[in-house]
Amino acid sequence: MIDALTVCFEVTDRYHYDRICELDFGQTYDMYEFQLMRVEGRYYNNVYTIIYMDGDSQVDFGQLKFNIGKVANPNNLHDNGNPKVWISLNNQSLYSNDQYNLGFIATKLGLEPHNITTLDLCLDTPYNVSKPLRQLIKNKAVTTILNGTRVKDRDEDRAEISYTTSGSLNKDNKYMTVNVKQRNAIKDKSRGVTITTYDKLAEIVNSSGKEYILKFYGNPTKLFRTEVHLNNAEIKDYLDSRGLYFNYYMIDEALLENMFFYHLNSVIRFKYGKQDIVWEQLLGRAS
């Protein structure tokens, strides 16, 4: 399951691009099937909300953004000189068929896909994954393989692994989130793979309010998430090393699941004697 997606595009036809560049904040550019409304952005000088109508309902599909201006040495052009444009899908679009409108919207705007900038993959289960994961890490009889290396000194600090607990005043460890990162991602998740396991139902009820996710699953009473955050470098390396092609407009669930488990196991896995303990087992995909 995709939980976050940002795709970098190349402007191959500047007609609409040049016109939306002229919009002031709050102004709208009408593409008939959808609209672009310019809004304030944090890192990009040009940010537009993509809106279209579904019957009587207005759908916030995502954001189109370009012209990075608030970081050092921004790179806003492809090697051929064409402008870079990014589209980030609204989270709710990923839990409906709205995501399949990406190809139509990009084509209408004169954009060609270039690469995936960020991709969050997740698998939701009716059982808690954080607890058995922590138990495996703490079990002295189990060898932890962290970022491809067997951990020999169990007393050495491991900044790659962190635990966060929350809950009530009387029970502050009611919920536990486990984060495991590649070393390059410890300070900046844009530089490596990050794994997170947590109570998704509690997160929705207590903070995010993403009720559409619960509706997507039929309003379960228990929902736990395992999530992998990937950046362009990891995705490109994975695809190139296997001679695979990522279809930006038709999601290949088998490819995504293989990519998901590959990166989970590349960051952390376990061995008990001669037995491998991998994420496919933790998440119920293998016995």
Q: PLM features: residue spans?
A:
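Structured, helix-rich domain cores that form ligand/interaction pockets
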Residues: M1-A286
